[in-house]
Amino acid sequence: MKSRKNILISLICMIGISFVLLSGCSNQKEPIVKSDHYQTKTPLTMVGFVDEASKKELKIHNEKEERFTYLLNKTKINNCDHLTKGDHVKIRYVENKIKNKKGKAIEIWLINPTEIVDQAQAILNGMSLEEKVGQMFFVRTPIGSGASDAAKYQLGGYILFDRDVRPYDKVGLSNQLQTYQNNSKIKMLIGIDEEGGTVNRLSRYLAYRGAPFLSPQALFAQGGMDLILSDVKEKAELLNSLGINVNLAPVSDVSINPNDFINARAFGKDADQTADYIGKVVNAMNENHIGSVLKHFPGYGNNVDTHTGIAYDKRPYDNFLANDFKPFEAGFNARAQAVLVAHNIVDCMDPNFPASLSKNVHDILRNTLHFRGVIMTDDLDMEAIKDFIGTSSPAVFAIKAGNDLVMCSDYANQIPSVLAAIQNNEISEQQINESVHRILTWKLNINIIQGGN
């Protein structure tokens, strides 16, 4: 009798243990595997590096060394004919739903081919710290010392304003810009704001074009997207002929209210229509070999002009997710490689710092929107920043926040401040290397420099 009782107790214990084990397994989350094992439960959006690519499947790993397999039976590959090991890619399921992804098509965007990444690293390895920091400054062209300052500071680039183009004709300006390039070990970004409409640094002068370029809204009203894309091509041809390789455009802000400060410069449609416009314009700029800069992240909305003071944005974060971020995401997906961050203070993201100086805002760009290109400040000489920074170094603030490129005039003082911050361990040299690698990658992608520099 006692033996039967013991057997019964043993059976009950075994059943109980089995139940606990089975219950635990059913509720246990699948662990993240950091090995050669590839998970088939794939995230909705992924940025990573190709390990293997075939017609049937794609194996990739992300920056955390997590590995995933994507089935390619329904795949749309944008901007690349094939993928090879080491390519930097972004993958997204077409339908924005996490569950029931079986059979859903995915889209793949090539961020950077592995050979571009390797070429940028090779150039970076041969640079001094001073040269690296110089590359992080995209500055107003100095009057009278453009060539000598290019040689002295090895600047990342010059931005042209009215005063820089007005004295010349096409041949004269082209020759002047070439003198800057001749004094740079690493060829410079030469940028200009040629948005069309109210902002035309170049075409406002008859020496460069018979009439100023029209605004996106005016072009769309006259001829739809076909006329806009024709305009993009003409701008690119003009800028390239002069030696200008970056147009600080397109304006990616969502504005449907004519009274908004930014409205006349924006597309003037809702978020989805603006996103469609931005994607097509960036694609056209890439096809015509001109660098694009999406601006002004995270979106001006109905804010005031930060050229004259700090703007405070009280809109909820959901508003940005549903509207303002969409055009920027469309631009990133079309392989825009630079984004300009505005000076407005966006309360829901960071109530204490302007967006351009906010680590929170830059984290959103990197971790929420998965942007891997160049982040640059708006002009640090604007009143919005002067009001906030006081006598401190705006460049140090900007780089600590996560900016790769600093836009300013006072580079002769700002560059030594950044070098001092590195020596004092305020800024790590690893961060500098990562930023300069992105800048070099951008220059390689738009053919400013080649692998051998």
Give the ranges of each region predicted by the language model.
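Preference for extracellular/luminal or secreted protein segments
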Residues: E115-D149, T368, F388-N453
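Phosphate/pyrophosphate-binding betaalpha-module
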Residues: Y277-V293, N323-A336
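Short, flexible, surface-exposed loop segments at domain boundaries
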Residues: K2, C13-E63, N79-I116
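Enzymes and membrane/adaptor proteins characterized by extended Gly/Ser/Thr/Asp/Glu-rich
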Residues: A151-T274, H296, G301-K314, A342-L357, ...
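Alpha-helix-loop-beta-strand connector modules within alpha/beta enzyme cores
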Residues: Y180-K187, K269-I290, A355-M376
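Beta-strand/loop nucleic-acid-binding surfaces
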Residues: E66-D81
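Short, well-ordered coil/turn segments that N-cap beta-strands
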Residues: G134-Q135, G156, K185-I190, I244-N245, ...
